[in-house]
Structures are given as C-alpha cells and as structure tokens.
C-alpha cells in the first residue's frame, strides 16, 4: 500500500485548521524535563507551528514542516514528553503523557490531523435558494442549516489514503479552516484568493461534509466535499 510519505506526486494543497492556545489542550511539549508552551492566541496552522517553534527555541529545539506537510521537532538529545494533545494534532500519534524517550528529533507519523496534505482541490459556490437544507455524512449526525448573510461553498478535496483517518478524526470537521496551495510552514506567506489571485488561500467555517468516495478500484485516492461558510464577499 502506498504511504503518504512515498506518494510520487507532492501535495498541491493543504487543508489546515486553526488552533486555540489560550487554554490548555494543544500547546505544550516537555523537552529535557522543561515544559515549553506556545504563546496564547487563535492561530492559523502555519502560525501555530511558528508558535511551537518559538516556544521550543528556548530549549535550542526547532519546529519545521517538510514538503509533504509533516511536522518535525529537532534539537540536542533530550527526553520528549507530550504533556497534552499537541503531539496528536501534529501527527505524532501520541496521547497526553506519552514519552518519545531521549531523541534528537520527532516527526509526524501520520498526516497531521491539524493540517492534511491534498493532491487536489476545487470549489464552487452553493445556491442557497436551491439548497437551503443540506444532508451531511452520518459522522456529523444530522443536517447543516444555511442561514444568515454568509456565502456557502462546496470545497471538493482529494487526498491519499493515509490522510483519510486524519481528516475524519475531527479537528478539520468543525470551526475555522484554511485551504492553501502554499506550504504551511512557519514562514508561510500567502494572500487571500480573489478573481485576480487564483492561487491565494481561502478561509471559512465548516458547516458539514458530503459524500466521501474512493476514486478507482485501488482505493488509494479519496474525494470528499466540505461545506464551508464565508463572509459575504470573501
């Protein structure tokens, strides 16, 4: 089976969540017995990794993102303990209090549930007059009701098999998300999408998920529609 780190085609898009570090949950890692905590804020994914990088930098470690979206923390040999769910969010496959032992680096073992790589993406505006009630997949337990002054979009996303569990794990199925074609590392710099900037990023709030399906008999590529609300004119 093809692994996400071995796919010949590099990601062309990323679906990234936002992370709240005002409260405990996804903000602290212990290195060499010292806890390092990301600065408080509501961070787009690249800024979140940047906040982690700044925090662990006090211990002479660094947080980076490779060209497939995997997060890597590295530095001098030290015991690494994930004191909260930051490790899980970054794809380390860990639970709170899990230890990596004494290491010089740790790298995402799965596509990070906080920001998954995509091998394709496109979007269309949803006609709210024709689609005032939208049925979503069963893991969302119900329907999305569309109302107010927001615009609704259907983002069609394609991902490799290994990214599907990370997508379904929940962080990207609610709250604010960003769709970007620029590598979401701490140096991320992009401009919003517009008619004159077709490669720009899109921000929105998840309303629901429609119709996941495998493309082809090998079940290596998965396609799903994400319903996203944006401010009028975004």
Regions found by a protein language model. Give the residues of each.
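Threonine/glycine-rich low-complexity segments that form extended coil/beta-edge repetitive scaffolds
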Residues: 1-54, 82-115
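Extracellular/virion structural assembly segments
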Residues: 1-13, 115-234
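Short polybasic amphipathic segments
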Residues: 24-31, 71-73, 177-182
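Secondary-structure transition/turn motif
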Residues: 32-34, 40, 72-79, 158-161, ...
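Short beta-strand-centered interaction patches in the first periplasmic/extracellular domains
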Residues: 52, 56-88
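Short glycine-rich, low-complexity/disordered patches
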Residues: 58-70, 96-104, 108-109, 178-190
